[in-house]
Amino acid sequence: MKEKEENLIAQNKKARHDYFIKETLEAGIALTGTEIKSVRARRINLRDGYVQIINGSAYLENVHISEYKQGNRYNHDPLRSRRLLLHKKEINRLAKVQAERGIAIIPLKVYLKHGFAKVLIGVGQGKKEYDKRQTIKERDQKREIRRKYGI
């Protein structure tokens, strides 16, 4: 039996509530030693994070990775910018998309794949308040149908 390759570390549940996700993309994250140890311990928060393109490189901003308990003086800054490992074509495409008004590039989840930390980033357009209410209403209707018909 094949072993599970992806190990989910953190998920940004609020992102799908606040944005219409148009496309997703997998990227590696350049982390220091104490950061990867904290990530493996699931001490990461994606809630306020976003991706920014600066000088042809993609950076993960405002993602909190807690300090490693045994890291002593070699610990990292919890909110530092972390470089995303993407191909140039992918970065250029994201830069064009980011230039559009109302488009955000946000981290959706962080997971380990074959021992490497990966982040699934999504290109999303912000939802208005009535869109959020409509989504909740549709979800409740689907839940009622499942209960009624036992699907």
Curated annotation (Swiss-Prot):
One cellular component (GO) term of this entry? cytosol
- What is any Pfam family matched here? SmpB
Biological process according to GO: trans-translation
Which keywords, in A-to-Z order, does the entry hold?
Cytoplasm, RNA-binding
GO terms assigned for molecular function = RNA binding
Chaperone: present as a keyword of the record?
no
Which protein family is it in? Belongs to the SmpB family.
Q: What role is this protein assigned?
A: Required for rescue of stalled ribosomes mediated by trans-translation. Binds to transfer-messenger RNA (tmRNA), required for stable association of tmRNA with ribosomes. tmRNA and SmpB together mimic tRNA shape, replacing the anticodon stem-loop with SmpB. tmRNA is encoded by the ssrA gene; the 2 termini fold to resemble tRNA(Ala) and it encodes a 'tag peptide', a short internal open reading frame. During trans-translation Ala-aminoacylated tmRNA acts like a tRNA, entering the A-site of stalled ribosomes, displacing the stalled mRNA.
Query: Which protein, by its recorded name, is this?
Result: SsrA-binding protein
According to its UniProt entry, this protein's organism is: Lactobacillus acidophilus (strain ATCC 700396 / NCK56 / N2 / NCFM)
